[in-house]
């Protein structure tokens, strides 16, 4: 039974989009069960409707970031509008917050999510078997109905990357001069590496995708 970790990138979540400082509060009413911990679905967070509008989170997905000493913790979540939450505050799972920072409240920031991950299994995952790098599939499989996701690459359970230039559901050793699969330390350096072909098989564990938006005229 195939299981794929789908990495979703949002090309319209630019680096210059607004970032707002917020108080992050743990909310015991927000569920953080096995599905959320195993990334089968995004956890929920609660935001004031005015803050959610400012973030311009088209898909309703935001990232809450907390910095503690020299570490940072990201909580990418499906935002729910709640007028009872102050505009400068975000509510997240109390269990998650306590586990990460050992407190019920913390200082943080929130912004439109640039990327996130969802894990899918059969029967949804079966629909991706045989697709190739450059193909698209229905975003509804990962909670993005109405959008297509473009396959950009992936890797197997040994970390061997899929290469667009290698046709078929294969694994082979090839001579590489650059990524994916090899990052040369010197100009002109080449190395023989094991890679996967451009086709998704049961051996693939991660699929890298990007959201396809309508072309702007």
From Swiss-Prot:
Keywords: Ribonucleoprotein, Ribosomal protein. This is Small ribosomal subunit protein eS6. It comes from the Archaea. Pfam families: Ribosomal_S6e. GO terms for biological process: translation. One of its GO terms (cellular component) is ribonucleoprotein complex. The keyword Glycoprotein does not apply. InterPro entries: Ribosomal_eS6 (IPR001377), Ribosomal_eS6_arc (IPR020924), Ribosomal_eS6_CS (IPR018282). One of its GO terms (molecular function) is structural constituent of ribosome. The keyword Ribosomal protein applies. Belongs to the eukaryotic ribosomal protein eS6 family.
């Amino acid at each position: 039974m195939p299981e794929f970790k789908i990495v979703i990138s949002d090309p319209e979540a630019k680096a210059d989009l607004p970032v707002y400082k917020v108080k992050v509060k743990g909310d015991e009413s927000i569920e953080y069960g096995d599905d959320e911990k195993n990334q089968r679905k995004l956890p929920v967070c609660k935001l004031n409707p005015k803050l959610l509008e400012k973030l311009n989170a088209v898909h309703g997905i935001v990232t809450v970031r907390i910095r503690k000493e020299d570490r940072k913790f990201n909580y990418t979540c499906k935002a729910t509008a709640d007028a009872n939450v102050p505009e400068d505050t975000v509510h997240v799972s109390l269990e998650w917050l306590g586990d990460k920072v050992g407190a019920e409240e913390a200082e943080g920031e929130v912004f439109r999510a640039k990327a996130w991950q969802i894990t899918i299994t059969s029967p949804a995952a079966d629909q991706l078997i045989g697709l190739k790098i450059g193909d698209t599939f229905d975003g509804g499989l990962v909670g993005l109905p109405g959008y297509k996701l473009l396959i950009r690459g992936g890797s197997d359970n040994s970390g061997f990357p899929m290469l667009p230039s290698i046709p078929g559901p294969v694994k082979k050793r090839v001579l590489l001069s650059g990524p994916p699969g090899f990052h040369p330390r010197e100009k002109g350096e080449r190395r023989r590496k094991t890679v996967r072909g451009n086709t998704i098989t049961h051996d693939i564990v991660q699929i890298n995708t990007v959201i396809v938006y309508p072309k702007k005229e």
